[in-house]
Amino acid sequence: MQKNSALWILRATDGCVSDLKYGSWTISSYEQEAATTLAAAGWSPITAAVLCSRGYDTPEKAQAFLSPDVPLSSPFALLDMEQAAARVKKALERREHICVFGDYDVDGITATCLLTDFLRKRGGHVTSYIPARLEEGYGLNEIAVRALHEQDVKLIITVDCGITANQEAALCRELGMELVITDHHECKSDLPEAVAVVDPHRKEQPEPILEMAGVGVAFKLAAALHGDQEALLAEYCDLLCLGTVADVMPLTGENRKMVWQGLQALANPKRVGIAALMAECGAMRPPITAGTIGYTLAPRINAAGRMGHVDIATELFLTNDAARAVSLASQLCKLNRKRQDVESGIYKQAVSMLPAGKSPKAIVLADETWHQGVVGIVASRLAEEYSCPTFLICLDGDKGKA
């Protein structure tokens, strides 16, 4: 990595850079002498200051931190990976109907597409399923489980969800279906009863915990079945990069390697869906950085789930038809423009509901016309603008959802 190109990846470690005019910011202290030494070694002064403030205060520490050339850990370092891989392998051998069940954000979509594509290329009879945000909500649910049972699905593999699906796991057993859970969210003390529960945050998981996105955990399952992680990374680093950056994972260790390789792949995309999306939204101009994902690609992919058309995004990443990909990319960008219009309308209405000339200590607003898939963005915007906790509630009869 060139030393003067390192700053973008440091910024991405903390997610998209916020507008500094809001809130109160405290700059971390650092040793000026150490920063001067790093600057003399070739880093820009601001990069040197950031590195020192994070404890990477020698050229050796800084280079080790920034280097994407790190070894990939064994997928079997994750608890229950052996059981998960064995059950999936059996399903492939028996030609059982498998469902990869994901989430409607970028991480969940890329995880779903990665594992679905991997299993189909190995002859799997695979259905992908992402719940409708407005009708089903987040994660594995009774409606979905029963629908999949009607389709004769024998094995459900969750990606980026499932770690709290205790009731749904019980329903799977009742219906004679088996469940493999892969997730990256925090675990409760009572895990769902499944064939395997693979999650870096399991309390019994040996240190160090892999802080990776749901797509990263899905990749580890594929790697356990494939055997050659480096070859698999070369094939799927584009999807890994999208999901990891969009989910604001720390860009350290394996995440840094995945994102670094992924950004190189995005500069010359081979997956027709990604190429079509980047062309449609004007993201092909170099340099391709984490900001390209955070500010340009991720909002458009997320729009599919927010606006209730997540199937457009999954088909886009799974299709091999270039003409179809162009059509899907166009649809996705139109959805994003619609999302922006809806968001703007809710924002203006919410601001008009606030008392003029006052600085609120908290904002709680509700309306029955607001779009549930978009209010979260508006709430975040208001919270940042007014520097206070903000709750926007979508009313539906006597119920409200935030």
Q: Would you name each region that the model predicts?
A:
Residues 1-31:
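N-terminal amphipathic/basic leader segments beginning at the initiator methionine
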Residues 20, 28-155, 175-176, 226-402:
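Hydrophobic helix-and-loop "lid/oligomerization" segment in the mid-to-C-terminal part
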Residues 114, 192-245:
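Short alpha-helices
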Residues 129, 159, 182-184, 198-200, ...:
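Generic beta-sheet signal
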Residues 134-136, 165, 185-190, 204-206, ...:
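Short gly/pro/ser/thr-enriched loop/turn and capping motifs at secondary-structure boundaries
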Residues 141-144, 165-169, 182-185, 376-379:
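Short beta-alpha junctions and helix-cap segments that line functional grooves
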Residues 155, 159-173, 178:
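Phosphate/diphosphate-binding loops
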Residues 177-192, 389-390, 394:
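Short, acidic/small-residue loops that bind anionic groups at enzyme active sites
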